[in-house]
Regions:
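Feature marks short, surface-exposed loop/turn motifs that line or immediately flank catalytic pockets
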Residues: 81, 147-150, 191-193
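A short beta-strand submotif of the Rossmann-like class I SAM-dependent methyltransferase core
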Residues: 113-119
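Conserved catalytic loop of SAM-dependent methyltransferase domains
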Residues: 186-220, 241
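Conserved N-terminal segment of class I S-adenosyl-L-methionine
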Residues: 1-107, 113, 130, 163, ...
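Short alpha-helix
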Residues: 165-181, 186-187
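Di-metal (Zn2+ and/or Mg2+/Mn2+) metal-binding site signature of metallo-dependent hydrolases
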Residues: 122
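A short glycine-rich, Lys/Arg-flanked "PGG" loop and its adjoining helix->strand segment in the class I
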Residues: 127-142
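Short, glycine-/aromatic-enriched active-site segment of Class I SAM-dependent methyltransferases
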Residues: 143-166
Length: 257
């Protein structure tokens, strides 16, 4: 059987991304990803933490600032991302390695926690990666954007512009994890914070900023939060922009047929 690695065009795309991407924008997005990681991991302590698809290292930097773990490790598909991580001089980071997207250079159950945040939607062979995470990690945190909507097949150009070749809902991600032999410990959903929407709207898209436009962003966020709290989990997941789950290897693997 031919060995599977990430395609060369995918590696090139991410090399270009980390060379050219806006540091302020990535730091802002990472701020909330870290909040989700910390929240879903409450009650647990970790010695060795590995981030798979660590990008430019901003998430590990913010976790290190919060003393989230004793030591950190990073693997990243792109050479430019690896260099950016090294430039951050993150305290307690023990290894920074480029990898092929599917094979982790670590032993079985050698990591207390693996973090995979906003990576799975970009992965060509998602189940292969999940099996490798399950081999190496005692626990795993996964976060994905909630991309799926009715008519998603008519918006392929939109999602591919962000590199999203897979789309998820909370239920579809849970199904994927359960059928790959994971046990879900804790999960959460969240909406895009107003400051993130404002940055993207006014800085990235360069739309005019005024009282009405900023008020609409704040109002939409508040309505979603209130509606979700009143009408429960089903509506909360429908309105969500992010889904975060803490999981581990299940004691019993699912049977097929």
């Amino acid at each position: 059987m031919q060995e599977v690695n990430s395609s060369e065009n995918l590696k090139t795309a991410y090399d270009n991304y980390y060379e050219n991407n806006d540091e302020t924008w990535r730091m802002l997005g990472a701020k909330y990803k870290v909040e989700h990681i910390v929240e879903v991991c409450k009650g647990y302590t970790f010695n060795k933490v590995l981030e798979v698809g660590a990008g430019d290292g901003v998430i590990l930097k913010l976790l290190s600032d919060r003393n989230f773990a004793t030591e950190y490790h990073a693997v990243e598909l792109s050479a430019s991302g690896v260099e950016r991580i090294k430039e951050r001089n993150i305290p307690s980071i023990k290894s920074i390695q480029e990898f092929d997207g599917y094979h982790l250079p670590f032993g079985d159950e050698s990591m207390d926690l693996i973090i995979l945040t906003h990576v799975l939607e970009h992965v060509e062979h998602e189940r292969m990666l999940l099996r490798e995470l399950k081999r190496v990690a005692k626990m795993v945190v996964i976060e994905v954007p909630r991309d799926y909507r009715t008519g998603v097949d008519t918006r392929i150009k939109h999602f591919l512009a962000y590199g999203h070749i897979n789309v998820y809902t909370p239920t579809s991600l849970r199904y994927l994890l359960l059928t790959e032999g994971f046990e879900i410990i804790k999960d959460l959903t969240d909406t895009i914070a107003p400051e993130v929407t404002k940055f993207y709207t006014f800085k990235t898209l360069k739309k005019p900023k005024n009282f009405v436009s900023t008020f609409k962003i704040d109002l939409e966020h508040s309505i979603k939060k209130v509606a979700a709290s009143v009408f429960g989990k089903k509506l909360e997941e429908k309105f969500a922009n992010y889904y975060t789950v803490l999981c581990k290897k299940a004691e019993h693997q699912p049977d097929i047929f």
